[in-house]
A protein has these predicted regions:
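Charged interaction scaffolds used for protein-protein
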Residues: 2-3, 22, 26-37, 61-117
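Glycine-centered positions within short beta-strands or beta-hairpins
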Residues: 5-7
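Active-site-adjacent beta-strand anchor residues
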Residues: 10
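Residue-level signal for threonine
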Residues: 13
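A short local loop/turn or secondary-structure capping micro-motif enriched for an aromatic residue
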Residues: 17-19
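Short, hydrophobic/amphipathic alpha-helical patches that form generic packing surfaces
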Residues: 44-56, 91, 95
């Protein structure tokens, strides 16, 4: 998504888990919804999560390719964005959470031998 004129990406990996837990009541990730459901805290929470998840994405890209220069999203990048952008930001955050929590299983092809092969 575009924020402050730049395309931004978000990624939820182990690196981001502790930082996001620190934002939750009692540092309990299962209570993150309390922050998003409180109107006076939801915008601040979304911005904080976006900054953390973007840093995770940028650091991951740099780790994969050391020539990649991270360009981190900052809280100030949101200063002159319309409030309506927060719906899209929240959607992107939730998408990153879903992707980061998705379990994948690698399987090897079955090598059948014998009579039924």
């Amino acid at each position: 998504m575009e924020i402050n004129g730049k395309e931004r990406h978000f990624e939820y990996l182990i690196k981001a888990y502790d930082d996001i837990c620190a934002l939750c009541p009692d540092e309990d990730m299962s209570r993150i919804g309390e922050k998003f459901s409180n109107p006076s805290e939801s915008v601040d929470m979304a911005i904080s999560c976006a900054v953390i998840l973007n840093k995770c994405y940028e650091d991951h890209q740099h780790h994969i390719s050391p020539d990649y220069k991270p360009d981190y999203l900052t809280r100030e990048d949101f200063d002159f964005e319309p409030v309506s952008i927060m719906h899209e930001v929240t959607g992107e955050i939730m998408k990153a959470f879903r992707e980061g929590n998705r379990q994948t299983v690698k399987t090897e092809p079955v090598n059948k031998k014998g009579k039924n092969a």
